[in-house]
Structures are given as structure tokens and as C-alpha cells.
Amino acid sequence: MCKIIVGGCSFTYNEGSWAHHIPNVINVARGGSGPITSAREVLVKLRETTGNKICIFQVSNPSRKEIIINDQNRLLFNRYNPQPLDENICGTSYYHVKGFGGTTTINKQYKKAIETFVTTMSEEQRAVESYEMLTLLQLYCKYNSIPLLMFYGWLDKRDLKGELIQKILQGIDWTVWWKQGNETMSSWLKENGHKDRK
């Protein structure tokens, strides 16, 4: 039996998402996470899963960034109580705090401090690092003959600006992307009569 390993953000993680309609699915998506965290979770699960498998990967906002918390930096974030979906990064005792594109804490002052820390990196740098990780996922699947389908949740490649990100995008294999990365699943759902739950 073929196992289907899926990753992404809340678009894939939340109950009732597309991933919950697939049999034999192993869903390692994390709500609010960016592509780096999501791809890392998928890569680890692909290595740990034996037998036939395929991978479906939903790309969230490429400028999202998380900070992994372990014993080395735990004291810096000791006022933060992680949500369950932010714990056990790749099955470890580590957790992460989300700075951009995700809820970190109800303490607004602390949330602002984390966002300031994370956003010292430009959106382009965060996107570059995300697409480098997506390139790694593509290469891993190709090397191990694992069929891969990738798609954008709501932002497609047309939203990416900057000289460096344009160079990095040249290394992406767009043949494994739904609509070659020129459309989002959100737009397809709306065009086909699906309603937003909000």
C-alpha cells in the first residue's frame, strides 16, 4: 500500500482540509508554519517512512520564518508557552516560535519583540531560504524516486520580487508543481464554487 506524506501550513493541517480526504495519508503539516519548517517535517517523515510513498507539498507564504527553541536558547524565550501545534519539531523535544505569518502568543508586547527579531531579515531573504529548502525537497524526492506534487495555497510565484529570489527560482523544477506554480489552490477553489469558512 502506498503511503501519502503531505506537508504545509493550516491550509493542509486544519481539520476538514484537502488532506483529510485522502486515504493512507501521513499529515505532518503545521498551522502557521512557513515552507522551511514544513519541508523539514516532510523530509524527516519521508526518511522515516518505509515502503512505497508519494509526497504532496503545499507551499505557504515563503516569507514566514520560525525560530527553533532548544536548550541553547530556551532562556531567551522563557515567557513563551508554545501551542501544541508548535511543539515536537520533527519528533524532538524542540518547539518553535512563529514570528511572521503566525500567532506566537497572546502577550502582544512579547509577540511584537519576536516579530521585530524575525523581521530583521528581509522578506526576500526569507523567501530565498524557503526556496532553497524547497529545492532540497525536490532533489531528495528525485534522488529517491519519490513522486512529488507541489502547489501554492494562496500566493504563487508571481508574488516574488527581487534579484536574488529570481536567481533562486531558476533552480526550481516547475514540472512537479500544479499549474507550474502560476496559480493557487485558493483561486481554483473559489472559481469552482467552494466557499471560505470565514
Predicted regions and their residues:
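Serine-esterase "nucleophile elbow" of acetyl-processing enzymes
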Residues: 1-49
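Alpha-helical cap/lid subdomain in secreted, periplasmic
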Residues: 43-197
